[in-house]
């Protein structure tokens, strides 16, 4: 059974997220956690606002969320899955690969990304793979598999 929250009471506050993930402005891309099963899956949101620095140059007059930042947001939600697994060594998990990532629609200021990640595999407590997808208003924006590795 998963832990979940209502729209008014997040499962994890921004402070709790910052205690679990090393990312900081401008790369802290998880605003709220809605569901979390350590070692299994997580669902979180990222609110897209015009005040974000990438929109100064991507693109003036037609701001679009860069695809690499959507993938990074998905990876950070994937990171929340493993950060509370008691048997894993502590350290920094980083990207090791990306498979089958596809972008299906633009993301613009005012959108709210709903990101769902599910752990697919974990090998030797150092290498893992998650299936990730991001939606806006129920419409698929991006999906793919993300691999990570523990850096000593």
From Swiss-Prot:
Any one of the GO CC terms: membrane
EC number: 4.2.1.59
Keyword vocabulary terms for this entry: Cytoplasm, Lipid A biosynthesis, Lipid biosynthesis, Lipid metabolism, Lyase
Pfam families reported in the protein's UniProt record: FabA (PF07977)
GO BP annotations, alphabetical order: fatty acid biosynthetic process; lipid A biosynthetic process
Signal keyword on record: no
Catalysis performed (reactions): a (3R)-hydroxyacyl-[ACP] = a (2E)-enoyl-[ACP] + H2O
Function noted in UniProt: Involved in unsaturated fatty acids biosynthesis. Catalyzes the dehydration of short chain beta-hydroxyacyl-ACPs and long chain saturated and unsaturated beta-hydroxyacyl-ACPs.
Family, per entry: Belongs to the thioester dehydratase family. FabZ subfamily.
Protein name in the entry: 3-hydroxyacyl-[acyl-carrier-protein] dehydratase FabZ
Gene: fabZ
